[in-house]
Amino acid sequence: MKKILFLTVICFCLSSIKAYANNNIHLSEFKNYLRTIKSVAIDFTQEDSYGKIVKGKLLIQKPYNFRCNYYPPFPLVIIGTKNFVSMYDYDMEQVSRISPSENIFNFLLEDNVDFDKDFVFESVINKGNIFNITIYHTRTEKRSEITFNKNIKQIEKLKIFEDHNIVTITFDKITKVQKFSDDLFKFKNPEIFSPPERLIKSEIEKKYVVSSK
């Protein structure tokens, strides 16, 4: 009986070690994927717990710049640079700012060193070609769940867990970009200058050149 129990414990330990090793491999693949992201345009659909659905395009120009461009009638645009993340509300005509480390897309901008410093991997769940990663952002004390497709090596979904809401962002199409128009990532004081340009899909796609690679 003791021998059987001992063998069972050994088998369990070996299975745990194998699972841990596999998780480390998948996490390494995920980190490598993040490192390869340089300049991209991402079509996305965002839905919250209350059923509100909005669409937009996320532009990333590493290491610091991004633009979360929601399409009308949703009234927000979020522009991030090295020093600030600025959000403009076209309906309220108001600006709010946070530090770059607090923005919800920060993990896409981090390099490997900063990622390990600012984020904690809490769990990895494998489901065939998909694995779900739960990460904890130490600076904002928020959790997110990332759905990563191992076959095509691409993020498919991001869930952001807020106090009374869950925001689910589905990445519909990811395009590599050769060059962005500089004005996409500039945010001037709307009280002195005009507000950031409000762009629909066809307009924003004229402001970058798709990479041929």
UniProtKB/Swiss-Prot annotation:
UniProt KW keywords: Signal
Pfam families: LolA
Keyword hit for Signal: yes
TM region positions: none
Signal peptide per UniProt: 1-21
Keyword Acetylation set for record: no
Name of the molecule in the record: Uncharacterized protein RP864
